[in-house]
Amino acid sequence: MRTSQFLLSTLKETPSDAVVISHQLMLRAGMIRKLASGLYTWLPMGLRVLRKVENVVREEMNAAGALEVLMPAIQPAELWQESGRWVQYGPELLRVKDRHEREFCVGPTHEEVITDLARNELNSYKQLPINMYQIQTKFRDEIRPRFGLMRGREFIMKDAYSFHADQASLQETYDRMHQAYCNVFSRLGLNFRPVQADTGSIGGTGSHEFHVLAESGEDDIAFSNVSDYAANIEKAEAVPREKERAAATEDMRLVDTPNTKTIDALVQGFGLAIEKTIKTLVVHAAEEGKLIALIVRGDHELNEIKAANLEQVASPLQMASEAEIRAAIGAGPGSLGPVNLPIPCIVDRSVALMSDFASGANIEDKHYFGVNWERDLPLPTVADLRNVVAGDPSPDGQGTLEIKRGIEVGHIFQLGTKYSEAMNCQVLGENGKPVTLTMGCYGIGVSRVVAAAIEQNHDERGILWNDALAPFHIALVPLRYETEQVREATDKLYAELTAAGYEVLLDDRDKKTSPGIKFADMELIGIPHRVVVSDRGLAEGNLEYKSRAETEAQAVPLAEILPFLQARISR
């Protein structure tokens, strides 16, 4: 491809509304253009990268035995009402009416549509298992679209759905898809981690997320420094570092603590170690009209997903108001604790192993110091309530946890029978009786992968594409292309490289465009290999080669350029 025949739309300045680096660089490199809030047009440069992601995804899905389909983006409300999600999904679901006043939605996901397809097309266990996927545009009406393609309203997704006669069959396909996802992200050259995850609003019994590691990621992921254990921070089990509770060395005493409403104030005002303090958080209980207290150590954070999953706690999690707390306990936030607490409480595992700790006294401006379980009060119900922190023991018993930021680019779920039961999706089983199908679903944010790859691979000059993702393998930059010698050598090399199967962008812009601008554009776009043709180099029988990942260029004999590039370019 020649730049004279291509839409090369690079920008010198960063648009003011672009915050994250992927958004900035995709705009500056001429990959995308904003149409409206959360909506983007893919330009030729960006579309070349997007298609490469799609092709790898498609190849791995086909290799895993999945069948490609294409479902409508517009879905009838009746299907969503059948599953119960018409009401549950909330304002992110864009609802529309046709000219006949029939209700539809713009699909954010396709569980209902595929389940409807399965119940109409499948009738026997002999047709199972079956796994169907599509690569298609989705729409979620995000309240605040931001970060470019990282959190837009319209996006491209690969979503697959599998149907099974039993859990064992689902597990087999789930494992195969897990491996297929690992293959996809490995082939794309990304530094990623598959992690255990909460099933969230999709539902089901088990799930894994796939995260590209990047400092700009929105999610915290925890993983062992020794084993393969990894989990989303919402899911990671918090194992106490202490093996047993230390013996009591202090007597419990009531202390005046005026204007001490936070852990920091307690620590600084009374010289306490933060590890000897606790936080008491009051939430709505599962029993209507009741409250329950959740207690974590002062230096730990409540994991709201874990809390909401407790049978004693209302879901979704709802914090009690100050008025509700005062009515139930007689004291306000900042003065609460387990001693003489008039409502039930659950303590975190780490709290259960504390001794000589400080807690609110359930009396305004007073705390108990030197509190010890069993001696001063019975140990209440114990549960895993907190987020893990770096240095915690790995739940698999191997090593300790590290925590890094990640960008979620894939998610796989074992749905079970959530949708098939709601929509009566059955086949005749081996015994001739109806069997409700067990389902799995598997998503990859195809357009998000492009942005995540940039978040992980960039420098001060622009994008750092690898060979698998780059819009072009080679930037061929002639200096003084208008001269006969340079043009002939460049055109001959261009023909040889394209004949060898390389994707080449020949920068044939005229002499008004300086070499510096050409080089800067190619580095901004992130083409991984640059070859420069010049009068001086040709006089010496050489071309100049520079890797995008390196700072220094090198001379390569013209006769050796093909084998030289073949040794460096992975395809």
From Swiss-Prot:
Top-rank lineage group of the source organism: Bacteria
InterPro entries: aa-tRNA-synt_IIb, aa-tRNA-synth_II, aa-tRNA-synth_II/BPL/LPL, Anticodon-bd, Anticodon-bd_dom_sf, Pro-tRNA-ligase_IIa, Pro-tRNA-synth_IIa_bac-type, Pro-tRNA-Synthase_IIa_type1
Keyword match Zinc-finger: no
Statement: the UniProt record of this protein carries the keyword Cytoplasm: yes
One example GO MF annotation: aminoacyl-tRNA deacylase activity
Signal peptide as annotated in the record: none
Gene3D superfamilies reported for this sequence: Anticodon-binding domain (3.40.50.800), Bira Bifunctional Protein, Domain 2 (3.30.930.10), YbaK/aminoacyl-tRNA synthetase-associated domain (3.90.960.10)
Entry keywords, A to Z: Aminoacyl-tRNA synthetase, ATP-binding, Cytoplasm, Ligase, Nucleotide-binding, Protein biosynthesis
Coarse class of the protein's main subcellular location: cytoplasm
PROSITE patterns reported for this sequence: AA_TRNA_LIGASE_II
Catalytic activity as recorded in UniProt: tRNA(Pro) + L-proline + ATP = L-prolyl-tRNA(Pro) + AMP + diphosphate
EC number: 6.1.1.15
A Pfam family annotated for this UniProt entry: tRNA-synt_2b
Family to which this protein belongs: Belongs to the class-II aminoacyl-tRNA synthetase family. ProS type 1 subfamily.
Free-text comment on this protein's domains from its UniProt entry: Consists of three domains: the N-terminal catalytic domain, the editing domain and the C-terminal anticodon-binding domain.
Subunit structure: Homodimer.
Function in brief: Catalyzes the attachment of proline to tRNA(Pro) in a two-step reaction: proline is first activated by ATP to form Pro-AMP and then transferred to the acceptor end of tRNA(Pro). As ProRS can inadvertently accommodate and process non-cognate amino acids such as alanine and cysteine, to avoid such errors it has two additional distinct editing activities against alanine. One activity is designated as 'pretransfer' editing and involves the tRNA(Pro)-independent hydrolysis of activated Ala-AMP.
PANTHER family attached to this UniProt entry: MITOCHONDRIAL RIBOSOME PROTEIN L39/PROLYL-TRNA LIGASE FAMILY MEMBER, PROLINE--TRNA LIGASE
Name of the protein described by the UniProt record: Proline--tRNA ligase
Organism: Ectopseudomonas mendocina (strain ymp) (Pseudomonas mendocina)
Organism taxonomic ancestry: Bacteria, Pseudomonadati, Pseudomonadota, Gammaproteobacteria, Pseudomonadales
